[in-house]
Amino acid sequence: MFNLKDKKVLLTGASGGIGQSIAELFSEAGAIVGLAARNEEKLKSLASSLKTKSYIFKFDLSNIENLETFVEEADKTMEGIDILICNAGITKDTLSMKMKTQDFKDVIDVNLTSTFILNRDMAKKMMRRRYGRIINMASIVGVLGNPGQANYCASKAGMIGMTKSIAQEYASRGITINCIAPGFIKTPMTDVLTDEQKSAMLSKIPEGKFGEPKDIANTAIFLASDEASYITGQTIHVNGGMLMV
């Protein structure tokens, strides 16, 4: 178990399956967790189950114009943030020939633009303390591409490139910035797939199984730890061998 005692973590997308798993694991390691998402009831339920102190921030990342205020509020409320995990994201899937420009823009705004603003504003605060860990949640499709997800793939590919750039800017200040690129992970989204769809996906995964949210949480807690202090600008692929790079 990694020791994150009294480290302060701000986690977006905290109400989903992966977010919940990350929050629980970080709390078990002693971290104080700030939970951010749109669904306040889910956040309250999650907060009540954690072993350490937590904070709830009801916020919609599509509200780009108020993101800077959100960062200030979270940092002030938690009295400084050591670890930022940008886990929130949306999809608006359809073939590119049918995709509305607004649907492309909406996904880019939530998945990429908001992540940039959070990285930029939080890194500036971390720089003053000469310590910080930032983890951005990318995706295997940001590298492979995926039909019907031009907007989502663009947002995740952009996130990977952005992370490399920002990581170079802050590496000398004690701040590491990395991506995690999950493959197919068991979530409510995979639960609704037909058996035929699941079989088609599993045939592409050498391990022959979907990942669990805890697989992503375990990767995140390593990147947030002191043991990962010499790792920055990287994309850690967690996909059962579906993509080997």
Language model feature labels by segment:
Residues 139:
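Residue(s) in the substrate-gating loop at a strand-loop-helix junction
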Residues 124, 168-172, 229:
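Alpha-helical segment proximal to the catalytic Tyr-Lys
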